[in-house]
Regions:
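Short, conserved secondary-structure transition motifs
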Residues: 133, 151, 155-172
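His/Asp/Glu-rich metal-coordinating catalytic cores
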Residues: 1-136, 142-149
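Alpha-helix initiation and N-capping motif
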Residues: 15, 84, 163, 184-187
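Acidic, Ser/Thr-rich peripheral helices and adjacent loops at domain boundaries
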Residues: 1-2, 147, 167-188
Length: 188
């Protein structure tokens, strides 16, 4: 932070560097390996967000597995994480590593809060991460309306350009979600 060898900090890479790197990208679907020099590479879906995978690198008989966030087996939108291969070295993100997720019924809590607030004539404002959490909240509200647990005429607005774009991606790739197609249609 604040350190550079240059009087005016220079970017780490140029637009041309980025374009050259993008031109070299080769899609590799989960479950299929590829060889890059002497390193075998593979991806395993981890159920966190659309496309989230652990990467496995195999070189000289040693296996390294790296993953960012790993999803939960009972996630509302995403399928459960797949088992990653055994590893000699495992690197994994650990924001919630020392916490157990509460087993509370989030939908029931949300229904109660929304219903109580609407009865008082109030509005509900729910800040949420634009990718993943916003889509899960939209689905939960959709299900609560369908079940009559919150007023069906309750307007719901997604007021974040990034969340709207992410929701469009979730809809486009709805086959990767764990929800039925009819529910995924409402994500658009």
């Amino acid at each position: 932070y604040g350190y550079s060898r240059h009087a005016k900090a220079l970017p780490l890479y140029t637009r041309r560097d980025a374009q050259r790197a993008i031109a070299r990208i080769v899609p590799l679907p989960p479950g299929r390996d590829a060889l890059c020099g002497s390193v075998r590479i593979g991806f395993t879906p981890v159920g966190h967000l659309l496309g989230a995978c652990a990467i496995t690198l195999l070189h000289g008989g040693e296996r390294l597995v790296f993953s960012g966030d790993v999803g939960r087996s009972n996630d509302l939108l995403m399928p459960a994480p797949q088992q990653v291969p055994d590893a000699d070295v495992l690197l994994v993100e650990s924001t919630y590593g020392n916490r157990a997720h509460p087993k509370d019924d989030a939908a029931a809590q949300l229904a109660q809060i929304v219903s109580d607030t609407v009865q008082r004539g109030g509005s509900v404002l729910m800040p949420a991460f634009a990718v993943g959490r916003a889509q899960a909240l939209m689905l939960m509200l959709q299900r609560l309306k369908a079940a009559g647990q919150v007023p069906t005429e309750l307007p719901v607005y997604l007021d974040s350009p990034m969340a709207v774009q992410a929701t469009a991606l979730y809809h486009k790739h709805r086959r990767l979600l764990r929800i039925p197609a009819r529910e995924a249609e409402h994500l658009a």
